[in-house]
Each structure stands twice: as structure tokens, then as C-alpha cells.
Amino acid sequence: KGKRKPRSIGEIVKRESIRPKHGALLFRLTNYFKSKNILQIGTTMGLSTLYLTSYATGLRCIALENVPEFATIARQAFAKEGRNPIDLRIGNYKDLLPQALNDINSLDFVFFNTLYEQHNNLWLFNECMKYAHNDTVFVFEGIKASRKMRELWEEICACPEVTVTLDLYSLGIVLFNKKLHKRDYIVYF
């Protein structure tokens, strides 16, 4: 009693991975916007990365992960699916992000799977925003998971560069298209 039982990889994957309907949405978004330069911050063992990159070949994806054990599982998943061109980088996000942004140069799609990085999220958003263009899409996971994440989402919605936000309760989608009027939508998903 009181001892923690070690969890199996299957239990960890089930708890930490993206839900299938959210993964399908990521696939549809990257497909619809024809994203060629994708950045993922936090891989959740690679499943969300596979959703992001499965719509086409010839795209560039840099995935950042700060948990080495998750990165090992992600790398195995990429190899199993034949997705070796995914550039997986392991380490602290604050150290990895500047070089990743410099390498990718222009962001088409960014998936922030950074629920456990709440203290860095605003910095990550602001750094990525410097490389955003009119057709860039940002997706945040866990926007209602905690008070800090809700506050972050409110700050993102208030950002003047952001034109449209979609609050899907557990996911948040951010658009920067200057042709669109500033709107914040709440959508049941």
C-alpha cells in the first residue's frame, strides 16, 4: 500500500498520447492548409507527429521533445511507420527552439503539446509568432486543462497579430490571416 506500481509503455501511451479524434483533426488541418514546414513542440511519443506528417511527402517537420524516454518511443514509432525524415530534437525547449526556428525559417503549422511546460508557453508562442505568416496555423493542446493554460489562451486570443481563434475546449486553433476579421469562436468538438 502506498507504493506506485510501474506503468507499462501501453498505459503511458494511452494516458499521454493525443486522442484519435484530435489526431484526425491535426491531419485534416495540415492537409487543408497544405503545410510544408511543421514544428511540433512536445511529441507525446510521436503519435501526434505521425498525424501531422501523414498527409504528404516532401514536407519538413521538426519535433522537439524534452523527455528522453518519450523521444525514444517517438523515434521507434517514426521508424516503424517509415517516417525517418522527421527531425526529432531532444532537450530543453528554450535551448532547442531558436535553432529549430532558424532552420525552418518560415512556419506553416505549429502544434504546441506543452501542457507540462506552462511556465514557458507564452515565450514559446511569442518566439514562434516571429516566424508566422498569413497562412500559419498554431494549435495548442490542453487550453482548458489548468488555470495557467486558460490564462495563456486568453492572452493568445487578445494578441493583436492573431485574427481568428477556435476554442474546441481541449484544443485551441490560432490563425493569423489578415484577410479575416478578428473573431474568437467557441466550437463544440
At which residue positions do the language-model features occur?
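A short alpha-helical cap/connector motif
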Residues: 1-111, 115-139, 143-189
